[in-house]
Amino acid sequence: MQRFVSKFVSTPPVPKKFQEIFPKKRTVNKILFQLDTRLTYHEMYPIFLQVSQNTNEENIPWRKKYPYIRSSDIMQMRNVLITLRTQNKFVHKDLLAMEDKLLNIAAELGNNDAISILSFNVIHEYKKENVKSSYEKDIETANEFIKKLYARNHHLTVKLIGDLFFENKTYDKAEKYYQEFLKLENSTKLAGEVHGKLGEIQIKQVNGFLKAEKSWLSCIELLEIERSSRWYFLLARLYMSSEPMKAKALLENCASIGFKECFKTLGFLELNYFNNYERAKEWFKTGMEIMDLECFFGFFDCCVKEENFKGARDCLESVKKLGNDKDKKTMINVFLESRKDSIKLLDKARL
């Protein structure tokens, strides 16, 4: 019964700014279906609206005003915004502020995931030199929360401890906590992220190829491509020399969501392994549009292979113009030196 109280809660007029930034109902419903949320769009919408208008100073009795909500619902609402941001690859500052507000509200309502995330946020802030002195009391409180949550085998806390060690490149400790997490849960999206990072640790180890492959395969099975494109790409690189067809399929998945690194890799794979110059040129052209220098190099090589000397000359001129950029100059000089024979061939073709 309480879940339907939302229908009778009077909602304030919807500000124009909120209408402009908040996603359409159809988009939100699609994400709610993906996340399998407990609340519907109509139950969430007035809360989203209230949160957008709420200032940090306001103390709103959320459970009294919206009796149907749980702290886990607030976290799911935050996940809706995170999913939207991930899929769109666009960050709107007001929606990002709403994510933070929702996290704080969930923590106020006693959600352990929210408390854990906020505690680790404090630790990350503490690492910045300019805030160390002012964060001593906060860091002490955050550490207390983390210790208590870890003692209760709180899943997210175990994972975030692993993440902290991973970021600090203390890989042996990161692996320990990641393995500990996977004993607690092994088939969730969070587990997918852990498998992905675990693979990055394992590939650095002696004879870690098979372990990394297994971890990344588990990762891409559990996570949608938008959240796992990095690990699709790393797995593809693992297969480049031994199983190029597998590598190609994985890279094409990455390309479908605009993962920048894969354009040149796909281009060189088509050029050097499959000898498909036209297809290689298509990938290189896509990379050239985002000014990936190596895609210019690859396109030049394709034109030379096809004896398309005009195309090769035009590409070479474009590369030389990019040489004015100091960051690119060294790479361009190496390219020009390594392609001396091809460049001589272009000069002969003019005669």
Curated annotation (Swiss-Prot):
GO biological processes: protein insertion into mitochondrial inner membrane from matrix
Main location: mitochondrion
GO cellular component: mitochondrial inner membrane; mitochondrial matrix
Keyword annotations: Membrane, Mitochondrion, Mitochondrion inner membrane, Repeat, TPR repeat, Transit peptide
Per-repeat ranges for TPR: 155-188, 260-294
Subcellular location: Mitochondrion inner membrane
Other known facts: Present with 736 molecules/cell in log phase SD medium.
Function: Required to stabilize mitochondrial cytochrome C oxidase subunit 2 (COX2) and to translocate the C-terminal domain of COX2 through the inner membrane.
Quaternary structure annotation from Swiss-Prot or TrEMBL: Interacts with COX18.
Protein name, per record: Protein MSS2, mitochondrial
Origin organism lineage: Eukaryota, Fungi, Dikarya, Ascomycota, Saccharomycotina
